Amino acid sequence: MFEGIKGPGAPQPHHNGSALRIGIVHARWNDQIISALLDGTLKSLHAAGVKQENIVIQTVPGSYELPYAVRQMYLASQTQHAATAGGSLVAGSSSGTADLLGSSTNLAGLAAGQQEKKEEGETKGSKEPFDAIIAIGALIKGSTMHFEYISDAVSHGLMRVQLDTGCAVVFGLLTLLTEEQGLERAGIDAAGKGHNHGEDWGAAAVELGVKRRGWSEGVFVQ
């Protein structure tokens, strides 16, 4: 648990994430810590109403790859959205088109059938661009400068992606001096006094996702 005044304030009011699409990308280094953080993140997202089918999880080898992966995930979600919108537009414009013999050709139905076959076996869920993406990693200081270089590069990289794309990026990178600090921040320390920061990241993603939608419409959401 947090001591003193340190820790996140509870979001006010509680935000409803049922309409959101959230991305998660996590490194695979320090898997015990990462797995617990991922569980905490998902727990928080589900508690806020985010549907499992609207959560996309990707993995990368290490934390250094997180900024690139976040950017590419967001671009991929934009591509999905454009493809879906384009298919709907074609179907709508061709509905009820009359042929030269005066009969009515239902091209919309044909297009819909082809689209269903194309999507067969694909994951169900929203194809909207991500409302927020959570980047999860855990760096533990060693005997070289590797820790400092990676921490700095990833921190600046994630901020740059957030500002360049306009997609909210939740900073889920733990920069740890010891393994014990990581266990505590993943809520799996032996003493049981830790707090799973993944729960905070999930709540932050929902809040930012809801506010981002409001801001894009000129509305200030509390």
Where is each model-derived feature located?
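Conserved acidic residues
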Residues: 131-133
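Charged, often glycine-rich, active-site loop that binds/positions anionic groups
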Residues: 67-80
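Short glycine-rich, flexible loops that bind phosphorylated cofactors or substrates
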Residues: 141-143
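Glycine-rich phosphate/diphosphate-binding loop of Rossmann-like nucleotide-binding domains
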Residues: 12-61, 65
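Solvent-exposed alpha-helices and their adjacent loops that cap or buttress functional pockets
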Residues: 13-17, 122-128, 161-165
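Intrinsically disordered, low-complexity domain-flanking/linker segments in eukaryotic proteins
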Residues: 77-129
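N-terminal presequence-like segments and the immediate start of the first folded domain
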Residues: 1-21, 113, 189-193, 207-209, ...
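C-terminal binding/interaction regions
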Residues: 136, 145-222
